[in-house]
C-alpha cells in the first residue's frame, strides 16, 4: 500500500525489450522500494522486425522466450514475497502479421496478462511507419496517420488474443512530446466510441497508461466515455522503461478513474482479471 492505495503497475519494460534499459530484477527491486504491491512485466513481442517495420515479418515460431523466463525467475528470487510479480507481454503491431503473432503465442510459456497495442500506421503508399518517425509539425500529417492508426486498432480487436488495449490515444503523446503539436481528438470521438464498444463486446479491456506522470492515455474525457458505454475492465500501467517511472502517478490515476465513474481497476493472474475497488 502507498498513501492508502493498492499500487499496481501493469505496463513496464526490461532489457528483454529492445528499448529497455534495466533488467527485470532491477525493475522489481525498484518497485519494492517504491511501495508497489503488484508488478507485471510487459516486454515487447513484435511479429515485425523491431524498428524496421517494412522488412518482411519475422519467421513463425522464431521468438525465443528463454531470456524472458530467465530474467523473470531471477527477479522472483531477488524480491521473494515482498511484491507480487506477474509475467506478461505487450503484443505490438500484431494486426500487420497476425499469423506470426499467433505462432509466438502458441509457443509461449504461461502468461498472466497481455496488452494489445498499436505504435505504427500505414502511409498512403502502404509503408508501415512508426508514429515516432513522423517529423512534420503539420497537424494534417498527424491526422492522416491517426486515421490509419484506428484502422489498425480495429484489426487488432478482430485478432483479439490479448486482455486489454494499450494506450489507445498514443498519437497525442508523440505529437506533443516530439514536435509540440496539439491534436484535437474530439474529431475521433466516433472512432474511439466504436473501438471501445467493440472491445467491450469481445470481453477486452482498456489500459489507462499513466504515461510517466504526463497526459494519461486515454485521459478523463475518453475514460468517461468508456464508462458510459458500459466498460468496466481497466488496468493501470506506467509504461516505465527505467526504474524511476515505475508506478508513476498511480494514486492520481486511480482517483481519475473514480472521478470518471469507474469503481474498480484490474490485475491479472493467468489471464483472469482480479478486481480492486478504488
Label each PLM-derived region with a short phrase.
Residues 1-98, 105-106, 172-186, 241-248, ...:
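An N-terminally biased module of ancient metal coordination in phosphate/nucleic-acid-related enzymes
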Residues 5-9, 38-40, 84-88, 110-115, ...:
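Structural preference for beta-strand elements that scaffold enzyme active sites
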Residues 28, 153-154, 223:
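Short hydrophobic/charged patches on amphipathic alpha-helices used for structural packing
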Residues 34, 109, 159-160, 229, ...:
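Structural motif
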Residues 43-48, 76-78, 121-127, 148-155, ...:
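Low-complexity, flexible helical/coil segments
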Residues 44, 119, 170-173, 211, ...:
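Flexible loop residues that form catalytic
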Residues 61-201:
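Extended substrate/RNA-proximal surfaces in nucleic-acid metabolism proteins
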